[in-house]
Amino acid sequence: MHVGRKMVEGGRCAEPAVHNFTESITRWGITTARMKTGTPVRIDKRSVHFEDMEEQPGDSDFHQFSYMGEHRVLKQLPCWTCYTNKKVHETLKSGLADSPLYNGQIQSTGPRYCPSIETKLVTFPDKDQHPLFLEPEGEDTNEMYLNGFSSSMPMDIQLNALHEIPALRDAKIYRPGYAIEYDYFDPTQLKHSLESKIIKGLFFAGQVNGTTGYEEAGGQGTVAGINAALHCVGDKTFEMNRDESYIGVLIDDLTTKGVDEPYRMFTSRAEYRILLRQDDADARLTEKAYELGIAKRDRYDWWIEKKEAIGRIIEFCANYPIKKDEINPKLEALGTTPLRAGCKLIDLIARPHLNLTNLSEIIPDLKAALETPANRKEEITEAAEIKMKYKGYIERERLIADKMHRLEDIKIKGRFNYSELHEISTEGRQIGRAHV
């Protein structure tokens, strides 16, 4: 760990280091390299002048992470925003010679999209200010996380710079920001199950695979844990495709492309984003989880009920006739083009400005159908509407994904000699050899 020129062995702050682990792995032929990450200063909220900051409240309308059970809203804590200024920048620049990132102390690569405050100053010298976000670490603590101020500068430089910000002029800190270098292992030496290709029965997950972020680690840990359990009982492996989950995209990227910088999952990395929607995660994964024994029967039954309810709404809309003379005045009142001929209700839902909510206000039969106990949950009507409104796009993307699956399922023997395949480029042969 690096704070200025001070270097300390450890895990995270106040956690012990793991010694000789890398050496015990690499002696079997597993490749390793180094990466770095950083974390911001932690501030005591009792020393902050919040009157000099702008409050940033949380969302008032948000989706649940789980559709199981009743919706329970937790107490919302606001974040606060402020900005750096020229004096802050001058203070930080005065300490660049002692910054591990610029004095040669750290040579490894850090996250592309999480630059330190000193990197921002060097990369964007024309900027007079950078935004900062003060975030509570919890309801029962005074510790606050200063997002945007990741740093490995000496502690006195960090503190002096903070004191140049009006809201933080009296700031006291729990601990300074610091950088940490760590080993990771080449993820292209892993199978899609996250089992090592070199050491049978050894599974890797998280930061050791070159990723950064809690969700990235959690997703890999879930897959690695499932496959480790399956391996112990001799069952086949569990793998997810790129069109089934973002975890599948992440693992496929790691194991086929490798990493040369800390990997973070973005929706832009997925080519099947219409299939990987927030509303259909249960549709994609519940049955798989139930078959593996990691989802209980009540979750599976709830999903079956939801699927049937969605189907009923879609069937109702697909069969419900709309007469133009009856609906046109109401459509004009909603600001949408009147019909030239009669149609089915599902055709109206495909229009951009129409949805189940506003149509239910002008079509009593639809309102009655949506208000039945089995259909009235928001997540059910939302999922049904998405399936109807984007039906053509979903089907087209499904065809593209299925075509790719047919190509992916053509197996190449492990001992295939790519060096003799002169019909492809040198780079192509090198990539092929690397993944044998």
Regions found by a protein language model. Give the residues of each.
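An anion/pyrophosphate-binding glycine-rich loop and adjacent beta-alpha core
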Residues: 23-159, 251, 256-339, 352
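Extended, charge-enriched "interface" segments that sit outside catalytic cores
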Residues: 269, 275, 286-433
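A glycine-rich dinucleotide-binding beta-alpha-beta segment and adjacent secondary-structure elements
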Residues: 145-211, 239-252, 377-429
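Glycine-rich loop(s) and the adjacent beta-strand/alpha-helix scaffold that form part
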Residues: 1-43, 165-166, 170, 223-231
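Glycine-rich phosphate/pyrophosphate-binding beta-alpha loops
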Residues: 207-215, 271-273
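Internal hydrophobic alpha-helix adjacent to the cofactor/substrate pocket in enzyme cavities
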Residues: 217-240
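Flexible, glycine/charged-enriched surface loops at secondary-structure junctions
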Residues: 35, 102-109, 168-176, 235-240, ...
